[in-house]
């Protein structure tokens, strides 16, 4: 699900979240 942050030029700060299509998501 969406983690509430974007990641176009910066990494995801929320633990467990990763970048998919410029959005930070997790596996849930």
Curated annotation (Swiss-Prot):
InterPro entries: Cyclotide, Cyclotide_sf. Keywords: Disulfide bond, Knottin, Plant defense. It comes from the Eukaryota. Transmembrane segments: none annotated. Expressed in fruit, pedicel, leaf and stem but not in root (at protein level). One of its GO terms (biological process) is defense response. Disulfide bonds join 3-17, 7-19, 12-24. This is a cyclic peptide. There is a cross-link at residues 1-28 (Cyclopeptide (Glu-Asn)). Belongs to the cyclotide family. The presence of a 'disulfide through disulfide knot' structurally defines this protein as a knottin. Probably participates in a plant defense mechanism. This is Chassatide C12.
